[in-house]
A protein has these predicted regions:
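Terminal targeting/low-complexity segments that flank the catalytic cores of oxidoreductases
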Residues: 1-125, 129-137, 161-167, 171
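Alpha-helical transition-metal enzyme core signature, strongest for iron centers
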Residues: 113-121, 143-158
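Short, glycine/charge-rich beta-strand/loop segments that flank catalytic centers
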Residues: 134-146
Length: 172
């Protein structure tokens, strides 16, 4: 018979103070004076290393979203990356229908990634107001910044090709 027991702080798997968190509505704990003198250095190297690797999805030196691409007559991905094109029923389609199927399948994949990036952004941002350690907060904010770039990049790519992403559904 399993008995319920309340976990004590000493029973927790992670014992690093950098991961100490408060309830989302506990702002009073976040402005305790002593908290400001207790910043861990656990994330400092990761944070400093990321500064050189940030990119701007709106800068054309990375990706030029204004380049035209004919999604009706050209594949966005190499054919070998699209296993659905090898299905016997699909192989009977004319070239234009195969291209449409392949590019819509790729749109679905890009939409799934975009929604995942949005989830990563929301999660990273939500950690900023519950992690008590300022180093952990800065790392979470840094990660939120990076995820926001991913959301912008994928959204711009999808919008430039199809106008908008596919919505989240039961399979996405």
């Amino acid at each position: 018979i399993l008995r319920e027991r309340k976990l004590k702080k000493s029973d927790q798997i992670t014992k690093n103070a950098a991961y100490e968190a408060v309830a989302p509505d506990d702002f009073a704990s976040m402005i305790e004076v002593d908290r400001y003198g207790e910043r861990s250095s656990d994330f400092d190297k990761i944070i400093s290393d990321t500064h050189a690797h940030f990119w701007d999805p709106l800068d054309t030196k990375y990706i030029d979203f204004s380049e035209n691409f004919d999604v009706e007559n050209k594949l966005l991905m190499p054919e070998e990356f699209l296993p659905e094109l090898q299905c016997p029923s699909v192989m009977k389609l004319d070239d234009k229908s195969k291209i449409k199927l392949a590019n819509e399948s790729f749109r679905w994949q890009m939409s799934a990634i975009l929604h995942g990036e949005q989830g990563a952004l929301n999660l990273s941002a939500s950690l900023c107001h519950i992690l008590k350690d300022q180093g952990a907060q800065e790392y979470a904010a840094n990660q939120a910044r990076e995820e926001a770039r991913h959301v912008t990049g994928f959204a711009k790519y999808i919008n430039s090709r199809w106008g908008k992403p596919l919505p989240v559904g039961q399979t996405l």
